[in-house]
Amino acid sequence: DTFGSFMGTEGTHPWSQGFPLTTPLEKFGGPALPDSVEVTWEDRFYPKAWGHPELREAIVDYYNSRYGSSITPENVMVFAGGRPGIYTVMAFLKEHIKVRIGNIEWPAYLDILTQTNTEYDIVPFTKENNFHPSNSEYFDREGVSEGTGLLPVISNPQNPSGQTRSGEELRELIEMAEKPGNGILLDEAYEMFHTPSVSGIEFVQDLDNSNVFLAGACTKGLQSPGIRIGWIIASKTNIETMANYSSFGMGGVSHPSQHYAVMLLEPSRVKKARAAVEQHYNWQRERYGKAFEEMGLGVYTGNGGFYHWLELPEGMNSEELNKRLFKHGAAILCAKDCDMARPHSKDPSYQTPYSRFFRFSFGPLLPETFESDIKLFREVYEEYKRDSGLE
């Protein structure tokens, strides 16, 4: 109602949106994206509950070649996007499992946890820990009964902050997750938005005897959110459980979309795509971050993803900033929406500790709009500062 156009359409500034560019990243040698997919008479049959064999093989080949893993197609379940896979994992957790989730995470996790009646504890995210708590905080058993299992839910690279666990830190996280009584759901939607690309599968020792769940998708790094293809990598036993659910609760995933995903994952193509995504978004992260620092914003962004995690000066708040941006066809994501400790009923009396924080997305922004995006943001921000008596 404020601007008259849907966010993301021409003339708007989709700084609140979580989608990537869906055109080739030509500046960095990104490959073309497929513009068609062949559909045969066989594709009009019902799809298999666990995913098309060709796509499962393509996913396996990608992870095994990139990360030195040894998964098989029986470790892969295909879903209609990333979030149905995450929802399914949560829906089938046993009653003695408690989730640990960061105070700041992807907003949809709270919906999923609530709708599946999952018990969860919050792990603090603060300026003091740089919005990057230690691995051990997710597995702290103080006050946890002996028969309770712990399952951290972590996006990595993290949405909204871009904080990333890689190398030895990620190895330690997976080692903890594989211990008896533990598990993990690692959401790797932004796997390619880090140098180098990062996946927990690199450090998994015994997937089939673990409760490690890795979520991936074509949505971000493969630049194709509209085809709605995602997957879960897990033990054969856990995949079998999810496939049983698919047969009665989902009915499989569109064959044409799965064929498109196979084309995206063609080995020589995906190698070029991964390199281009890394370079393009590293470049965007760096120059937007520098511009925000020059404005005097607090920048707490990690080295992954395509968001900036920013703090306004004292005396300002992100909700008021957003209202002012709306008038110009722009928006940010207020941090309160990422606050996993807020009541899901959206109790108006709840005061988030993150009122000055917000997420700025450079994911869908074209390189040539950098100057105009920063100019508009600076104008609205500076006007708000003046009105707040801060200048």
Task: List the predicted regions and their residue ranges.
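N-terminal "arm"/small-domain region of PLP-dependent enzymes with the aminotransferase-like
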Residues: 1-50, 65, 147, 182, ...
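Conserved PLP-binding catalytic core of the aspartate aminotransferase-like
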Residues: 22-23, 281-282, 296-329, 337
